[in-house]
């Protein structure tokens, strides 16, 4: 009986976690206003590619553009950019911050 209760409790816990909405990581917030005023992710990818980046993936996180890719120096990173100005705000490699813009 106790085993059945534990299994039911575990199943309910897993189901509750699975139905939680995706949340921002909290590493960076941009407060960039409505998305209608943002530049596109495609424009950011084009700009980074011209600078020598290899972009694997982009997404919106915390009101910023989050980019997974390789820098021109060959570092595989996660980077955050302001969606209006494309200012680089944070770059981290394997959880270690290697660049953070002043004030962020």
Where are each of the predicted segments found?
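Glycine-centered tight beta-turn/hairpin loop motif at sheet-sheet or coil-to-beta transitions
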Residues: 72-74
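Conserved histidines in hydrophobic membrane contexts and catalytic metal-binding motifs
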Residues: 67-70, 81
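Short beta-strand
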Residues: 57-59
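Classic N-terminal secretory signal peptides
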Residues: 1-23
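Short, non-transmembrane alpha-helical segments in secretory-pathway proteins
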Residues: 30-55
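A short, surface-exposed beta-strand/turn
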Residues: 77-91
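Short, low-complexity, Pro/Ser/Thr/Gly-rich segments in the mature regions of secreted, periplasmic
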Residues: 95-104
């Amino acid at each position: 009986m106790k085993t059945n209760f534990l299994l039911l409790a575990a199943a309910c816990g897993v189901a509750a976690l699975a139905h939680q909405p995706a949340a921002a990581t909290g590493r960076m917030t941009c407060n960039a206003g409505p998305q209608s005023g943002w530049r596109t992710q495609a424009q950011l990818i084009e700009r980074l590619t011209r600078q020598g980046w290899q972009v694997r993936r982009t997404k919106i996180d915390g009101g910023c553009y989050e980019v997974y890719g390789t820098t021109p120096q060959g570092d595989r990173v996660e980077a955050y950019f302001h969606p209006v100005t494309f200012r680089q705000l944070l770059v981290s490699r394997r959880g270690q911050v290697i660049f953070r813009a002043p004030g962020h």
